[in-house]
């Protein structure tokens, strides 16, 4: 008998394995007292106890095999609202099935922010019994087709109940399906079980579930007189309690039962280059199932974020940067536009550089010395290529003579004390090169940025570069500065967990030099344990960039911001091109701006809500110009203690306790 049972279980597993991911509940062992004793915990017993009492915790098996004594250790009190121990029991019955169904018709229940148990009892009928039940139903409707007196006196009044005729036809179709054994029929009893120690809170939960079920076209009732029977009928193995059991077929059953679970993400960072058991990037809220967000899929953490302006992109980028600091020896390099990352950077002790802008705090303006590092052959080769780019940007056609002259001068400067651009110009022999580089020396408009004797950039673990002013300076000034910054960042990538955040990436996707650099980063930075996060509000620029296929393939994680125009012609095609289906586009279109985000990875997809509190929003969501001006003033006045005063200004009078400040 045991052999037959095990074979039957194995066959069921094999049948389900084709479409479902199932795992057998087992008894596991755990060593105690340094290995002197072994404790046994049974998952099946734990699940059955959860069904009965609503308490989900490990159940340790006793040494004596009297396991049933550990299942029901709570008292059940009958009534309109039954009680198990000190917790009230609520039952929501699903009835009034709609005329048609589709897969996952009740998946919206997954979004409810509460704990419940959904029981779907189905009592199978064999083919002959199902045909008999359906035949009785057919005869009942057949009798209603013609009026009673027409049937009694065998007359034809031409009065026909067309609804009854339709039901007869549908019943005959059901009989044909049962006879062909394409589907099986049975009695279906769905109920949702809730527990709560507060009666009013339980009633509110039950009413919320009832409203959601009714919104999907079903009927639903909160059980009262039938509550105890419905609860008992929901327990595993109980087939006789609860008389509410409509007859449906297995095709409808497959649509109604919850076959899919909500993707909760990995509790640990999936990247093998991170320390073992590193936590996920963040845990956020969404319905009753927490969501653990990770940028990485295996060892690739490149992420594409896109959505319209004003939908919460800057807040998301700031939160990603803040959460990334949880990893040991992490490095964060962010290219910001609009100073949205200023509050977080200063609060975290990072460096915030406003490149090309006026220094708001009266300090010496930032200036670079790109030729300061010429120690290795690779450094000198890069310097020569960088000088060549500057000359080409001024409209000079580069010839071999130009390259030889520039390379020769870079080599000479490697052993010289002066390494500014002015030193290079004074030493190079060709007049065309001198004239082209004049624009970038102290005598030209860009000398303030690129012609320093000593580099003012000291890169630490958290660096933010505000490039809004730089972006307005034109291509000839923008390209050299960003190319140099990219070079400095690349040299710091030593295998530590790193992330490069590019806000308003459409500005860079529109330039061939940066397109090539982004393409290169997406292909090679994975080996340096660095993730690239590209955020853009211009979907059309991303599509016209020429590397949309590279973005799609190299960025396995895509985070979409709410976009009410996602279903409109033109925008829809972009979402479809990067692999989104009709349902996903609908989710993006209906999501709440500045609150909900839709993440898609090869491992799953999820609409989530970051549910940020007021303290977090004070640093990742304070991007208004008035807020930024106050923060700059507070930082200038109080230095490292400015966050306390900032929070106090926003109504947190006990802010000092958050920072352990007396």
Swiss-Prot record:
Gene3D superfamilies from the UniProt entry: P-loop containing nucleotide triphosphate hydrolases
KW ATP-binding (keyword) present: yes
Residues where ATP binds: 307-314
Domain of life of the organism encoding this protein: Bacteria
Protein keywords: ATP-binding, Conjugation, Nucleotide-binding, Plasmid
InterPro entries, A to Z: AAA+_ATPase, CagE_TrbE_VirB_cntrl_dom, P-loop_NTPase, T4SS_component
Gene Ontology molecular function: ATP binding; ATP hydrolysis activity
Family: Belongs to the TrbE/VirB4 family.
Name this protein carries in UniProt: Probable conjugal transfer protein TrbE part 2
Source organism per UniProt: Sinorhizobium fredii (strain NBRC 101917 / NGR234)
Gene it is expressed from: trbEB
